[in-house]
Amino acid sequence: MKKLLALLLTFALLLTSVSAVLAESEEEPAASEAPEITYSNDEITVAVTTPLTGNFFTNMWGNLSSDLDVRNLIHGYNLVEWDTEEGVFLPDNAVVSDMLIELEKSDDVKITLTLYDDLCYCDGTPITAKDYAFSLLLTMSPVIKELGGNVRTPEFLAGYKDYINGTAKALRGVKLAGDHRLMITIRSVYLPFFFQLGLLDCVPYPASVIAPGVEVADDGNGVYLKNAKDLTADTLKETLLDEASGYRTHPEVTSGPYKLVSYEDGKAEFEINPYYKGDTHGNKPTIKKITMICKTSDELAAALKDGSVTILNKVTGTEAIAAGLQLTEEQETLTSVSYDRTGLSFISFNTDRVPLDDLGVRQAIAYLADRDSMAEEVLGEYGVRAGGYYGLGQWMYLLLSGKVTPEEPDEDASAAEKAAYKTKMEKLGKLDLEEIEPYNRDVEKAVKLLEKAGWKLNENGEAFDPEKDTVRYKKTKDGLKALQLTLAYPEGSAASKALEETLVKSLAEGGIELKVEAIPTDELFPQYYRQEKVKYDMYFLGTNFEVVYDPSLYFTETKDGHHQWKTNGLVDDEMWQLTVDMRKTEPGDLAGYCDKWLQYQERIAEQVPVLPIYSNTYYDFYPEALEGYEIAANISWPQAIVSAYFEE
């Protein structure tokens, strides 16, 4: 079963070489006329299409894919790693020398991790168990919330609630035993957990840099911060958030294969971390310097052609992909790979704002939005309208869509193994993605929903006439209210035309006036994550889901004990419970997990806190001479680049 999950996740990341036979005009120069570009291990430049915003510390202030790439490049020595062959999380063999799992009398599970004593930050400072404990304690500190960040809520840790509520001085679920031994206790109520050791996902952070004067201590009852009075919002504003030197944007002491040496004007520069001992497979980086920049889709092919960029990562859009493929046809020195996205682009409704607090209005928008045309305009043949809140590359979709079939047992397998396989296939066969409401475009259905919700008048208070009226109105205690909505999307998005023209026009057919505005990402995401005041009714953005897919983390508990989706305001205990049921699936029970995942997708479609727009295929373009760039065995280019090199 573990092997099957590994197969599915590897398939989701699988990169297949692509080629295209494209017509060439007589005026086009022959490939031999192109200037010769020399590549070396001295330096490369990677171009991405999502701007870097400087969230290089954690995802607490945002989680754009480009910022995540930087974090994967400079923060290393995670306690665990995803093993693509076994399909499970395992201790990172470069970090953990020994692991012991014990069942306690309370049925809690204690995991003792012994760390190697040769781990260092990029400045040579030793890394100990205290650095991991500090990472946990800092990211769950209420001071983070004062600074506009999303506080981590590791509810799986024993003693979490007592510690976070201030009724306990120490976090008893994390203990120290010397400099290189860490004991983590998982609450029994949080088990089973489908991704098992994925709960131990943790990288070290230097307390001496982020919180000078603060130390991690353990008097036998669990870890706590000594001199915690020094961990104030004012202190962290300087050490974390200072625009010129704060650890959030300029982390100088880090643990990954590369260290950040410069970040300015949206461009980041990295050099090899000389103290990096290597990953679990012994890989150490060869390429000395990396520059990471953001370019618009129409700039990508030219930059690769003239050699100013070495790798184009996650290219989307019909024109950009076509230009890249044509370039690989013209120049044999260049190649490309494609892989299905493990996420999607979507519209997030702020369901606690009028009129989107009305389910009927959200459903009406779903029926009105011409998502097929939007996907076609933006992606052409390289994407499709999203069928739910998932990506084409997620293993759950691949399994239920039949794109991946579980491997049959060997002929010499036992009768029990064959029976288990048959049962599993029967369970999977009963699951159907078509159970998710597709919201195929239907103006008539949308109009009925709007009228039922009271939006049936015109600006004069008379019955709305679609032949002559444009905007619907509703009678409220404050008078007539127009059905006018606002939507913000990131500047430079390839979907700008689809949003400003196609979406606006399709909603107008139902009597909804939509005003669309492009805003900088450093304005959009703080609003989306509700770190700043929400100014729009809807946000258009994209996401790629992590390997540890635990949507229960999307929710927070309200003061009256209900559960609210943090980014869109939807209060839905049933949806939250479905996410809890998902994570508590027994490890290896793929059919059981997919069953709960499908119910979760159906609930999202029913309540419409988000409207899935499209998912797509990504393309990477890079020199043929770049050896070892094995994306299929990795999750992102920073992980693949560690083993990549140019033969010299």
What are these regions (language model features)?
Residues 45, 128-135, 179-183, 257, ...:
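Alpha-helical secondary-structure segments
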Residues 47-106:
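N-terminal lobe/hinge region of extracytoplasmic solute-binding protein
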Residues 97-152, 177, 183, 355-357, ...:
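Aromatic- and charge-enriched surface segment that lines or borders ligand/interaction sites
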Residues 149-234, 404-416:
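Surface-exposed binding/hinge segments that line
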Residues 190, 198-285, 289, 443-452:
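Gly/Pro-rich hinge or "lid" segments in bacterial periplasmic/extracellular proteins
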Residues 244-249, 266, 275-324, 513:
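Ligand-site clamp/hinge motif
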Residues 264-265, 425-428, 433-443, 454-542:
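Ligand/substrate-recognition segments at binding pockets and active sites
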Residues 267, 368-423, 447, 495-504, ...:
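Detector for C-terminal structural segments
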